[in-house]
Regions:
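P-loop NTPase motor domains
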Residues: 2-179
């Protein structure tokens, strides 16, 4: 759940990270109808709470992990919070907990390869969403430094098959372009 404080020139990095985590939770919890308004509100509140320590002191060891969000959800009074936490449990302490840690990938390298081939069916969509978030963080950091970023994606059809992931990606990309009448 890394956060780049230069995530956007226009929007709050925390708002964008909350939007990402809402997309993540929508994949996990949402079902066909997606997240309900109360669920979105609870998740947004918990995201703001879980990132507070990092925003006060932005050090790598303060970056929250999914387990921190899970813990804060369990502390909330709404029954929806408990349902969301229960849905996240398999990704926090269950058999699909591969993303419940700080990243071990050095994304500062000039060339980074994300390989999600070995992720099982249950994790592939989440893996694609996380990769898109990491790439976006790198693009914004490079933009702040005046550097171009080249992004090559093999198996693009996997991204195109997933409407929610593609929607999240497109929303971020299109926000950077101006349309002139």
């Amino acid at each position: 759940m890394d956060i780049n404080l230069n995530y956007s020139e226009d929007e709050s990095p925390l708002s964008l990270k909350s939007d990402f985590i809402l997309s993540l939770c929508e994949l996990i919890v949402g079902g066909r109808e997606g997240l309900q308004p109360i669920e979105k509100t609870v998740i947004d509140r918990c995201v703001r709470m879980v990132y507070q320590a990092y925003l006060n002191e932005p050090r790598p060891e303060n970056v929250p992990i999914l387990g921190d969000l899970h813990r804060i959800l369990l502390e909330q009074p709404e029954k929806e919070a408990r349902l969301i936490a229960t849905a996240l449990e398999i990704y926090v302490s269950g058999s699909l907990n591969v993303f419940n840690h700080r990243t071990n990938v050095n994304i500062q390298n000039r060339l980074v390869c994300f390989d999600i081939k070995e992720l099982g069916k249950q994790l592939k969509k989440i893996g694609m969403l996380i990769v898109q978030d990491q790439v976006w963080g790198r693009v914004t950091a490079n933009r702040a430094d005046g550097r171009a970023t080249r992004y090559y994606m093999d198996e693009m059809h996997l991204l195109l098959k997933e409407g929610r992931i593609l929607q999240t990606y497109a929303k971020r990309e299109l926000a950077n372009y101006q349309v002139f009448d």
